């Protein structure tokens, strides 16, 4: 596995390619179009795009023709006109009886009917919205609203490998939820709620291996990456093991873990933690995984250059395993990190100090 990963990392393209990313902001009405040259390692701001609102989370549709975003009380969609320009198409106020909650996360179905799933966070419970799209992929209407019950606080969503299950990571409710997805309408129906293995684990984000046999879950409060096995017949989740996202002996109360993503080749997993104090760094880690998705080993646990603020959100590249993007909201920047075989290092930093940057990033190409 290590030799395969090293080969992937050290193989370089023949010619330089400019890759494009979009970056969201927590507190300012801006989206940022960024370019990364994979040979010169230059990271540049291509466009500072004024938007309808600040956007806490951004995600692309299956064709990369639309960008979907969250705001305090709404969902929005932007048409991608060029790799560095966006056109606002639609904003929908979130629906549901979730007082004090804010729109926090979106996930899009990659097959017909291409519905978009959103969840709110905060207040006394979370609400979920199922959103239809129009012929151009823009958000159209909220076709279903549901809630997760008192005490819930869902912060992350993932769609199963067969596109028939919606998994929800319930940070406040210390559990994972499972809903079936109707293949005709895209609407969901409750199936199960699975408690975390220990009190105060607080599942924050979740991602599913393409073969559908494993789920990777960030435990925000205990600062661990948890591995769940999935029964491919029943889709039942079973906790199996976990790995630390802060050094052993460090107090969990000083950290809050954040994001998890599979690499492009699915040969390893990236995960991050944030520090609650500006004078402590967050951490970035990678894990070698088997062909079936089981976690084999933790490759490294490396401090990030800042606490990460509310971000330290990792975004894997869509063109290879060598690079990932990392955003920071303490100082307001995006970085590109390179995997070197047994460790990782920063190769480019772009300051976007715009009184609100940066939330998460997505690679357009």
State the predicted function of each range.
Residues 21, 67, 116, 166, ...:
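Hydrophobic beta-strand positions that form the internal "hydrophobic ladder"
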Residues 16-42:
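An edge-strand/N-cap motif at the start of beta-rich repeat modules
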Residues 33-41, 77-86, 130-139, 179-187, ...:
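Short loop/turn segments immediately following beta-strands, especially the blade-tip
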Residues 1-18:
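Fungal secretory targeting signals
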Residues 51-63, 95-112, 147-164, 196-214, ...:
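Beta-rich, blade/repeat-based domains predominating
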Residues 43-50, 87-95, 138-147, 188-195, ...:
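Beta-propeller fold detector
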Residues 329-335, 340, 345-365:
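Blade-level signature of beta-propeller repeat domains, shared across WD40, Kelch, NHL, RCC1
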Residues 26, 70-72, 119-123, 171-172, ...:
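Short loop/turn segments immediately following the C-termini of beta-strands
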